[in-house]
Design a protein with these regions (language model features):
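Phosphate-binding P-loop
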Residues: 59-67
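Conserved lysine of the Walker
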Residues: 80
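Walker A (P-loop) phosphate-binding loop of P-loop NTPases
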Residues: 77
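Charged, amphipathic alpha-helical linker segments immediately N-terminal to NTP-binding catalytic cores
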Residues: 2-50
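Hydrophobic positions on the alpha1 helix immediately C-terminal to the Walker A/P-loop
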Residues: 83, 87
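Conserved nucleotide-sensing/catalytic segment adjacent to the nucleotide-binding pocket
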Residues: 37, 98-100, 106-214
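ATP-dependent NMP and nucleoside kinases share a basic, alpha-helical "lid"
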Residues: 156, 160-168, 216-261
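Post-Walker A helix-loop "phosphate-sensing" segment adjacent to the P-loop in P-loop NTPases
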Residues: 89-99
Length: 261
C-alpha cells in the first residue's frame, strides 16, 4: 500500500470529525438514481465510518495494493444508497478516492420484467404446491384466478375465506425464495470480474448501466486511476455468490421500513 493512502487512513483513524454535507456528494451509478439524505442516514454513516477506516487499511495491506472493496447491504428502505454516498463523501474528504457502484445495474432483467418473472415463479410455484398436496380443484382454480386478477393471491387476509390458500402461499414463497438473489436473477459473475479488475489495478473498467426499458442498456468506461475504495451498494452485497468484497456492511431495517419503500 502506498504511504500516501496509508498515512491518510492512519491520520483519520487517529482523529476524524464528520465534515459538512455539500450538494455534490457522490452517489451510486444507477441511471436516474436519486438520494435523499436525512438525519438517520448521517447518524448511521458517522457510526460506521470510524470503524470502517481500520478495516480498509487492513484490507489494503492484505491485498498488497492501495485498493479495497466494501459492500453496503440490507433490505429495501434501509438507506443503502444514502449511507454508501456518505461513506464515499467522508473518504474523499480525507483524500481517499472512492467510487459507489450500484448492484441494481446487474440483474439479468429490467425491473418490470424481473417483477413479472418473480410473479410468474410465485404463482406457478403456488399452483404446483396445491397439486402436490392434492388441494387443487376446478372450483379453487376459479377462485384463485379471481384473486390473481385482483392481485390478492398473496394476501394473508384471504386465507380466512380460503383456507387452502395457505398451502398455495407457502409453496409460492418457497418457489420464489429459490429465485430471489440467485444467479438466475443476478449476474454475480460480472460483479466478481469487476472487483477482480479493480483489485489488480486496472485504471479503466467498463461498467454496466441499465434503465427501465429494454433498450436502456449500455456500458460506460469509468476511470479508476484515482480510486482506492470501491463501495458496492446493493441488497445482495453480502451474498456468497460473488467474490472479492473485503468488508460487508449490513444495515438493519424494520418490516415497516421495507414495506414503506
Amino acid at each position: 500500500m502506498t504511504d500516501t493512502i496509508s498515512n491518510k487512513l492512519t491520520n483519520a483513524i487517529e482523529g476524524w470529525s464528520a465534515p459538512d454535507i455539500g450538494p455534490d456528494i457522490p452517489h451510486g451509478d444507477m441511471p436516474g438514481d436519486k438520494i435523499v439524505i436525512n438525519a438517520a442516514h448521517i447518524e448511521k454513516a458517522r457510526i460506521i465510518f470510524p470503524r470502517l477506516l481500520p478495516l480498509l487499511k487492513n484490507a489494503m495491506e492484505q491485498n498488497g495494493a492501495p485498493r479495497a472493496v466494501a459492500a453496503v447491504c440490507g433490505g429495501s428502505g434501509v438507506g443503502k444508497s444514502e449511507t454508501a454516498s456518505l461513506l464515499a463523501h467522508y473518504l474523499q474528504q480525507i483524500g481517499v478516492g472512492c467510487y459507489v457502484l450500484s448492484g441494481d445495474n446487474y440483474p439479468w432483467r429490467i425491473p418490470a420484467q424481473n417483477d413479472a418473472e418473480r410473479l410468474r415463479i410465485y404463482r406457478c410455484g403456488g399452483i404446483r404446491g396445491l397439486l402436490t398436496a392434492n388441494c387443487y380443484t376446478a372450483e379453487r382454480s376459479a377462485a384463485l384466478m379471481e384473486l390473481m386478477e385482483k392481485e390478492l393471491d398473496a394476501s394473508a387476509e384471504q386465507t380466512k375465506g380460503h383456507p387452502w390458500l395457505t398451502v398455495y402461499q407457502q409453496a409460492a414463497r418457497d418457489a420464489l425464495s429459490g429465485y430471489l438473489g440467485s444467479s438466475k436473477e443476478q449476474d454475480f459473475d460480472q460483479l466478481t470480474d469487476i472487483i477482480s479488475r479493480f483489485k489488480r489495478g486496472d485504471t479503466h473498467i467498463w461498467l454496466k448501466r441499465m434503465g427501465r426499458t429494454p433498450e436502456a442498456l449500455w456500458y460506460e468506461k469509468v476511470d479508476f486511476s484515482q480510486v482506492s475504495v470501491l463501495i458496492i451498494e446493493w441488497t445482495h452485497g453480502n451474498s456468497e455468490k460473488y467474490q472479492g468484497v473485503d468488508i460487508p456492511i449490513l444495515l438493519n431495517s424494520t418490516p415497516e421500513e421495507t414495506r414503506e419503500h
